Amino acid sequence: MDDDDSGIQEEPAPPPPPPPPPPPPPPLRRLLTATRSGGSRWVDGSEVGSSESAPWSLDGDRSLRLSVDSAASAGGASGGGGGGGPLSRASSGAFRRRFGKQPRRVDSLDVEAMSVRGAHGHSSKEISMLSTVAMAFQTLGVVYGDMGTSPLYVFSDVFSKVPIKSEVEILGALSLVMYTIALIPFAKYVFIVLKANDNGEGGTFALYSLICRYAKVSLLPNQQRVDEDISSFRLKLPTPELERALSVKESLEKNPVFKNILLFLVLMGTSMVIGDGILTPSMSVMSAVSGLQGRVPGFGTDAVVIVSILFLVLLFSVQRFGTGKVGFMFAPILALWFINLGTIGIYNLAKYDISVVRAFNPVYIYLFFQTNGIKAWSALGGCVLCITGAEAMFADLGHFSVKSIQVAFTAVVFPCLLIAYMGQAAYLMKYPFAVERIFYDSVPEILFWPVFVIATLAAMIASQAMISATFSCIKQAMALGCFPRIKIIHTSKKVMGQIYIPVMNWFLMVMCIIIVATFRSTNDIANAYGIAEVGVMMVSTALVTLVMLLIWQTNLFLVMCFPVIFGSVEFVYLTAVLSKIQEGGWLPLAFSSLFLCIMYTWNYGSVLKYQSEMRGKISLDFILDLGSTLGTVRVPGIGLVYNELVQGIPSIFGHLLVTLPAMHSTIVFVCIKYVPVPYVPFEERFLFRRIGQKDYHMFRCVARYGYKDVRKEEHGFFEQLLVETLEKFLRKESQEMALEASAMAVERDDVSVVSDIPSSPVEAGDLHVPLLSDQRLGDGTQTFITEGNTPVLPTSSISEEDPSLEYELESLREAIASGFTYLLAHGDVRARKESFFTKKFIINYFYAFLRRNCRAGTATLKVPHSNIMRVGMTYMV
């Protein structure tokens, strides 16, 4: 039979004896961390013996990773296509300890996600060429509106500072514009900055979250090792670049000054983007409307201001309907606009003076500065307007792909803008005094009205892009704890990024009206416009440089070239625009300072409040001493205790025990936590653990969200999912106990994770998807627990062998029938008496003012007021 089974024919020699059976797998234990003495430790606290392998493996791409398999698969190192021998246990342990320091205390939530499906990366789908072209067409209407409308006002602002005396001024200004576009948007953003994306997300906060994942630089101390397993987290083999990256990482983590500087840069960049949201609509709309001057008799400055204000009111009034209602028109209008720019530019080149192509010679930049001196330096403030909106290429990356943005800029935007500016320069070579309205004067008479209509629509679309970017920045800042809670309305059921913030919308409208009515001139607004743009670019340069050092591990020479080349150019432009502070440049600085103070104060107060909660948390021993009744009467019902702690029992629970005459039979501590990733997959969102013994009926639930995730769940559906998940948790816990008992395992670690994954793929952009899934948890749902791929026992057999499970499930059903109660803290944050005056002023007045006027936390839960119970607390920070 053995010969037949193995397919061996008759041979004179007897078959070799079968190999000895492999040793049985070790007990269900998991490797967690390295001990202080250099050894390894299991989750249950026992040391790894000398015969057990270190928790490392070397895979084919020559990268180190922490093994999440059972001990049977964790031993040794396996070589791959990349070759290379196994690392020694001592060197790998020291390297791991240096890359990511372990928490002092082993908490179950630090281990639970080690078996999360997809923890080591998510496969990226290749986008077809047709899809890339279609996406590139869409970027014209969303990304490039601001930059595309810059020909309306660039030359008029430049030559308002440098009068045209000869062709040197025209060719020099044209050469400056051409090389500025080629250097900043084309070289910096298209080829470098776009690659520094956070899983396809761009913007200042995306860079910050990317840095926070590789170094613990967030000031809010709620980071956990478990968060590293949300997305791919790999350690490369030791190299000089990696050693340098580790040194940078350690410096950032150890020095609180560096953390504050990094946060300050991020908040300043975000504040500048909000400033752009105020200045862009004012500048774009007023530039488009000013084309009627000289064409319509009696249409003077007052008429321009009034019509611009009417357009602005209309623009902000339709925001509540969402960009999706008119978004399909954006790309065709902007495509038509770029075609007009290129066509009119070619017409002017052919008709007036094609010799302006000499501006490709950068020597005219030198002649421009040599001839005009300080005036030429002042003209840089107008020249920088040609790259307004360049940051949108990176900020709006989440809606498109890197390749689509690169294709659109390289194939359409870049050539059309160059031709448009050359056409205007050719017109000025013949009519040097037509600088005030150079764009409309260079348009052929027969095309004026069609071009005016398209220009006005393009200006409003450009304004829409910056308004939407402002809304997105506010939402991201709120998610990362850097902005007070305000109302956010999702205007699309399919597109997650389409949001509307009423308070910010009307604030922007009022500010835009004030700016137009006060400045009354595009040249004066341009003085303020440039500061915000250059400020955002310099912040992105600093953050991308840090990404190169810490994450990309680029060669040091190339790293230094990036800030030296681009940073020096941006610094020169910054000095030019800062010289216009008295002429209107103070405006963006005032707006940025206001929002910077708001965001930094909110973050500062939130960090102090969290630290105060950590100091006041209740010990588990105290809860155990109270017994299963918790020192009070347990009545049927489920109490959801909302708190911000990821570990420990919050102090609000102690207040509840003292204040309430009875306590719910089932207690779930719910922590809503935002992690520095754009999206958390639904199957990785929830972490569960049991607190105390079974008869306590107390659980912890940590719900993790990315800074671009949407929380839009009705309380009834959320409660249903929570209960079903809790039931799954209890069954898997019982199953785990049965398996360990049958395997004669060592003392069981009572930690489990339930990941409920829908049988059909879930799209992150669908707002109908709730916290876990949009399906009832049933037979078609896969479940995973921490102890690897353990076999699943039938529910019936488990319930027969474990009566305590049926008792606990019956108690849960009784609690469900009695209903849910949401228990929240209504806290007052006060500075301690011994604090400095500045801290008292910030916390007791400014932060308290923001807390009183921000949106209440209960408003985001969408729970009937009859189901909410709030307990007053005072946090001394």
UniProtKB/Swiss-Prot annotation:
Key word Membrane present: yes
Give me the Extracellular side stretches, as residue ranges.
Answer: 148-173, 282-295, 347-379, 428-441, 520-524, 579-583
Q: Transmembrane stretches, by residue range?
A: 127-147, 174-194, 261-281, 296-316, 326-346, 380-400, 407-427, 442-462, 499-519, 525-545, 556-578, 584-604
Q: Where is this region: Disordered?
A: 1-60, 72-92
Regions of this protein lying in the Cytoplasmic compartment:
1-126, 195-260, 317-325, 401-406, 463-498, 546-555, 605-877
Q: Name one GO molecular function term.
A: potassium ion transmembrane transporter activity
Q: What is this protein called?
A: Potassium transporter 23
Q: Which family does it belong to?
A: Belongs to the HAK/KUP transporter (TC 2.A.72.3) family.
Q: What does this protein do?
A: High-affinity potassium transporter.
- Name the UniProt key words of this record, in alphabetical order: Ion transport, Membrane, Potassium, Potassium transport, Transmembrane, Transmembrane helix, Transport
- Organismal lineage: Eukaryota, Viridiplantae, Streptophyta, Embryophyta, Tracheophyta
Q: Which GO terms describe its biological process?
A: cotyledon development; potassium ion transport
InterPro entries, alphabetically? K+_transporter, K_trans_C, K_trans_N
Q: Give the superkingdom in one word.
A: Eukaryota
